[in-house]
From Swiss-Prot:
Organism, as annotated: Rhodopirellula baltica (strain DSM 10527 / NCIMB 13988 / SH1)
UniProt-recorded name of the protein: Transcription elongation factor GreA
Organism taxonomic ancestry: Bacteria, Pseudomonadati, Planctomycetota, Planctomycetia, Pirellulales
GO BP term (any one): regulation of DNA-templated transcription elongation
Zinc as UniProt keyword: no
Coiled-coil spans in chain: 53-73
PROSITE patterns hit by this protein: GREAB_1
Gene that specifies this protein: greA
Entry GO MF terms: DNA binding; RNA polymerase binding
SUPFAM superfamilies noted in UniProt: FKBP-like (SSF54534), GreA transcript cleavage protein, N-terminal domain (SSF46557)
Pfam families: GreA_GreB (PF01272), GreA_GreB_N (PF03449)
Family matches, as PANTHER family: TRANSCRIPTION ELONGATION FACTOR GREA
Function field: Necessary for efficient RNA polymerase transcription elongation past template-encoded arresting sites. The arresting sites in DNA have the property of trapping a certain fraction of elongating RNA polymerases that pass through, resulting in locked ternary complexes. Cleavage of the nascent transcript by cleavage factors such as GreA or GreB allows the resumption of elongation from the new 3'terminus. GreA releases sequences of 2 to 3 nucleotides.
NCBIfam families noted in UniProt: greA, PRK00226.1-2, PRK00226.1-4
Record's keyword terms, sorted: Coiled coil, DNA-binding, Transcription, Transcription regulation
Length: 159
């Protein structure tokens, strides 16, 4: 079964723009560099040629990965989701039960994630551990170091 990738319309558009940029700006530059390197002669020992071919392959892999996300995209209308539990699009304030630290996360879809600003993928193990919880409940999240417990303090929507 193909797993859908939840995202907002903005996240979808951001990924489409990134694909467009890669295909229409980066790829032509790499193709040009390959052509220039090919003109230098013997391809067997042409390091520049091989490096650019490798760059081309890596860029194509990135493009294909983003195309796959777009193909499996499920655009979510955040305004239709429940407001009393942790769901896609909400900002949740949690307390680490073990240490008492408060943290805030926004659960987002592909294309919107930004871990430095607390925007985490709803499909990540951490995001999945929080989904469905209500204020006052405790979420257990599996991480490589073991299980972490977080108490849900506040759920907000920035619509």
């Amino acid at each position: 079964m193909v797993e859908s990738v939840p995202m907002t319309r903005e996240g979808y558009n951001k990924i489409k723009a990134e694909i467009n940029r890669m295909e229409n700006e980066e790829m032509p530059m790499i193709v040009q560099k390959i052509a220039e390197a090919r003109e230098e002669g013997d391809l067997k020992e042409n390091a520049e040629y091989h490096a650019q071919r490798e760059n081309q392959g890596m860029l194509m892999a990135k493009i294909n990965e983003l195309r796959d996300k777009i193909a499996r995209a499920s655009i979510i209308d955040v305004s239709s989701l429940p407001k009393d539990e942790v769901v896609f699009g909400c900002t949740v304030t949690v307390e680490d039960v073990a240490y008492g630290d408060e943290e805030q996360f926004t659960l987002v879809g592909a294309g919107d994630e930004d871990y430095d600003s607390g925007k985490i993928l709803v499909t990540s193990p951490f995001g999945q551990g929080l989904v469905g919880k209500k204020v006052g409940e405790t979420a257990e999240v599996d991480v490589p170091a073991g299980k972490l417990k977080f108490k849900i303090l506040k759920i907000e929507f920035n619509l």
